[in-house]
């Protein structure tokens, strides 16, 4: 009886609310209004100034928060706000970078020289901001990995060292992420759906089990579209 009462009185989790309002524009709009202070705080951490509703960056942040609501699912980790914060900062950084390049094109020659000097400072500033955002992306990845009882040290130790092996495993990952049923089982049970994977790939169960942690990690990375981590992977770092 007590457990039933507690269940009724328990405040719904943000993540449950988000999943319930994804197809309801009125509820979604009310939710966005409720979290405007959070949106402003995320934008301000990038711009390092107070953000008003008249700022272009504010519109970018609102749109990114709306995208976070629409995209959020079990694949994005336990915290909706951590996921939304990533999207807001990423989009605001992209906007600032594009605007600085765009403004330079339409300036006179003497103004361009002055602008170029400003851009040197802006470039350093953007590097600093991106380093912070990269760190947050890695921390988000680490928290989702922890749900699967996988640590960074384990992943580093068990990741394949040879490029051809990694490429072959990525093909397996692509098979998994295209199948919603497999992804749902992966994130719900926190283990590879081997029974569904085996008939679709030309590798043994033993191979799948040996590279289990790497395959799971790649599924998490692609499902969350981690910008910086994906750039690192596509850059082919540490090939042998």
From Swiss-Prot:
Disruption phenotype: Disruption results in increased sensitivity to heat shock. Loss of SigI results in a coordinated decrease in expression of all three toxin subunits. It comes from the Bacteria. One of its GO terms (cellular component) is cytoplasm. It is found in: Cytoplasm. Residues 194-213 bind DNA. GO terms for molecular function: DNA binding; sigma factor activity. A motif (Polymerase core binding) lies at residues 56-69. Negatively regulated by the anti-sigma-I factor RsgI. Keywords: Cytoplasm, DNA-binding, Sigma factor, Stress response, Transcription, Transcription regulation. InterPro entries: RNA_pol_sigma-I, RNA_pol_sigma70_r2, RNA_pol_sigma_r2. One of its GO terms (biological process) is DNA-templated transcription initiation. Induction: Part of the sigI-rsgI operon, which is induced by heat shock. Expressed from both the sigma I and sigma A promoters. Transcription from the sigma A promoter is likely more significant to virulence regulation. Sigma factors are initiation factors that promote the attachment of RNA polymerase to specific initiation sites and are then released. This sigma factor contributes to both stress response and virulence gene expression. Belongs to the sigma-70 factor family. SigI subfamily. NCBIfam families: PRK08311.1-2 (NF006171), spore_sigI (TIGR02895). Interacts with RsgI. This is RNA polymerase sigma factor SigI. It comes from Bacillus anthracis.
